[in-house]
A protein has these predicted regions:
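Ser/Thr-rich, low-complexity intrinsically disordered terminal regions
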Residues: 1-34
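Intrinsically disordered, low-complexity acidic/polar segments
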Residues: 13, 38, 81-83
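Short, internal acidic amphipathic alpha-helical interface segments
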Residues: 30-69
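Short strand-loop junctions, especially beta-strand C-caps/beta-turns
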Residues: 32-34, 75-77, 81
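Short, aliphatic-rich beta-strand segments
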Residues: 70-74
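A short acidic/glycine-rich loop-to-helix N-cap element
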Residues: 78-90
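Long, contiguous binding/interaction regions
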Residues: 87, 95-100, 104-105
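Short, highly charged C-terminal tails/helix-capping segments
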Residues: 106-113
Length: 113
């Protein structure tokens, strides 16, 4: 597991964890706790997450019912020789996607009117 943290334009910090497959030819990039969902906002956040999943092709948003948070996940396959380039690109795209989607998530929670 590799952990990286960056500041975005709308949210900071963005903590990313890279989970590499046992064959070292795939990776799952996960950003846990993008937003904490208060009681009574589950339906609103599920609608927002579904909308974001329909909009973003390579990122998956999901609501964790156990800890009441939203996670963003991106996966990629690669050859050993291009792992650095692919993981860097994945990280940049993930930061952009989270930055772009954060206002929608916060609006669903009633933080932005």
């Amino acid at each position: 597991v590799v952990s990286v943290s960056f500041d975005g334009n709308t949210i900071s910090p963005i903590k990313m964890l890279f989970f590499f497959g046992t064959d070292s030819q795939d990776v799952s990039l996960q950003c846990f706790n993008v937003v904490k969902v208060p009681e009574g906002k589950t339906e609103a956040i599920l609608k927002a997450v579904n909308g974001l999943n329909a909009h973003y092709r390579f990122a998956k948003f999901y609501f964790d019912v156990d800890d009441k948070t939203v996670t963003v996940q991106m996966d990629a396959c690669f050859r050993t020789h291009d792992v650095g380039e692919i993981c860097t690109e994945l990280m940049i795209r993930c930061i952009q996607i989270i930055d772009d989607s954060y206002p929608s998530l916060m609006k669903a929670l009633g933080a932005f009117q």
